Amino acid sequence: MSAEVEVFCDGACSGNPGVGGYGAILRYGSAEKELSGADGDTTNNRMELTAAIRALEALSRPCAVTITTDSQYLVKGMTEWLSGWVRRGWVNSKKEPVLNRDLWERLRELTGKHQVRWVWVRGHNGHPENERCDALARRAIDAYRNERR
C-alpha cells in the first residue's frame, strides 16, 4: 500500500435522535476532498460512523489511512470492541445487541481493504481539521432543513 491518505471526520446531530450531518476531509499529499451529508432521523453516533464510512468509500484503491476523529465511540469501537462483538455474535459485554450494527459491519468491511490507523482528538478544542469537519456537518444539517421548508 503505497498511497498514504489522511482522513478527518466528524458527525453532528441537532437533537439526539434528530437531524444529523457528517463531514469528512480526505487529504492525499497537497490534494484535499471534502465530503458531507445529512439524514433526517439519526443519532450523533450514527453520523460519526457514517463520516468514516463515506470517507473510506471515496478511496479508489487500498491505502494506508490515518483516520482522525473526536469520537471515542468510533475509535474504541474499531480498536477495542469490534473483535469481541463479532466473536459474541454482535452482542456487547452486557449481552445486549450492538447498536448501529449495520454501520459497524460496513466499517469492518471497508477497513479490511486498507491499513487503517485510528487517532482520537478532543472535539471543539481548536484542531483545525476537526473544526472544519464539524462545520461541514453543521452546514449539511442546515441544508437538509432548508430543503424541507
Curated annotation (Swiss-Prot):
Residue runs in coiled coils: none
UniProt keyword Transcription regulation, yes or no: no
Compartments reported by the entry: Cytoplasm
Molecular-function GO terms, alphabetical: magnesium ion binding; nucleic acid binding; RNA-DNA hybrid ribonuclease activity
Reactions catalysed: Endonucleolytic cleavage to 5'-phosphomonoester
Domain RNase H type-1: 1-142
The record's free-text note on cofactor binding: Binds 1 Mg(2+) ion per subunit. May bind a second metal ion at a regulatory site, or after substrate binding.
UniProt GO BP: DNA replication, removal of RNA primer
Superkingdom of origin: Bacteria
EC number in record: 3.1.26.4
A GO CC term assigned to this protein in UniProt: cytoplasm
Function description: Endonuclease that specifically degrades the RNA of RNA-DNA hybrids.
NCBIfam families from the UniProt entry: PRK00203.1
Family: Belongs to the RNase H family.
Name of the protein in question: Ribonuclease H
Organism: Geobacter sulfurreducens (strain ATCC 51573 / DSM 12127 / PCA)
Name of the gene this protein is made from: rnhA
